[in-house]
């Protein structure tokens, strides 16, 4: 019987030890579970924060695209406004010249003087906006700037020289707008 009692005491002792181990394990598991839940909640908050940031960034990008599109449309729509404002005095001068030419006491010289002034005004506006005239009389023919309307033999000029300009060309900011239309020596 004493063996039984010893066995019983050992079993009780083992059961108590197992209970303590089981309770410690349970407490450790609870602590780990609590830590994991806290980490999960933190990750959820971070994910929500990142989602909000991404949505705000997306909205900002959409607003930027819309503003940029509107700015480009406005720039295209009003790109010539400064140029037109500079040309208005030229137009006014032409109109005054036309009105003056219909008067009885007007002379050809006064009309010519008015036309010369208006022409100079117009050229000044063009120069202000970097529009240059291409007037190549006496220069070597350049197919990048000139358009040969015809070629004629000319003993007075070297071959490929511009003899006459039918229509002057124009360059805007070093870019050809219209080639000079010319007669070239053969």
Curated annotation (Swiss-Prot):
Molecular function terms from GO: adenyl-nucleotide exchange factor activity; protein homodimerization activity; protein-folding chaperone binding; unfolded protein binding
Protein name stated in the entry: Protein GrpE
InterPro entries linked to this entry: GrpE, GrpE_coiled_coil, GrpE_head
Family indicated by similarity: Belongs to the GrpE family.
Gene: grpE
Main location class: cytoplasm
Endoplasmic reticulum is among the record's keywords: no
Disulfide bonds: none
Places the protein is found: Cytoplasm
């Amino acid at each position: 019987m004493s063996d039984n009692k010893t066995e019983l005491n050992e079993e009780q002792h083992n059961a108590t030890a197992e209970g303590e181990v089981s309770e410690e394990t349970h407490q450790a598991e609870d602590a780990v579970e609590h830590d994991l839940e806290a980490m999960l909640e933190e990750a959820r908050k971070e994910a929500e924060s990142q989602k909000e940031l991404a949505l705000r960034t997306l909205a900002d990008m959409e607003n930027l695209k819309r503003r940029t599109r509107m700015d480009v449309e406005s720039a295209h729509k009003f790109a010539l406004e400064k140029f037109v404002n500079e040309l208005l005095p030229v137009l006014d001068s032409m109109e005054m010249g036309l009105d003056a030419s219909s008067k009885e006491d007007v002379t050809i010289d006064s009309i010519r003087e008015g036309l010369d002034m208006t022409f100079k005004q117009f050229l000044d506006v063009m120069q202000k906006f970097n529009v240059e005239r291409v007037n190549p009389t006496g220069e070597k023919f350049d197919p990048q700037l000139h358009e040969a309307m015809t070629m004629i033999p000319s003993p007075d000029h070297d071959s490929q020289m511009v003899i006459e300009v039918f229509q002057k060309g124009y360059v805007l900011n070093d870019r050809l707008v219209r080639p000079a239309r010319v007669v070239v020596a053969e």
